Amino acid sequence: MKYVDGFVVAVPAENKEAYIAMAAKAAPLFKEFGALRVVECWADDVPDGKLTDFRMAVKAQDHEEVVFSWIEFPSKEVRDAANQKMMSDPRMKE
């Protein structure tokens, strides 16, 4: 069964380019270590909810945007190994 790591994060709007650069750097490494797919989605049309929504989930402030992303792996074992490799790979420290 496939395994997915999902993320919802608040990113200051002025840091959008830096976030995109970081994501573009990390995605090929995740794929090298076994990820099938890496998806990054910068919020465009995220309406405010009444009970909950993406902005409330991450306590986004007015100057922040929501990013929804996920990494798909063939299994949890591959995901666990990939995360270990990512944490120790010197390219992630550059």
Task: State each model region's role.
Residues 1-68, 72-92:
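Short S/T/G/P-rich N-terminal loop/turn motif that feeds into the first structured element of a domain
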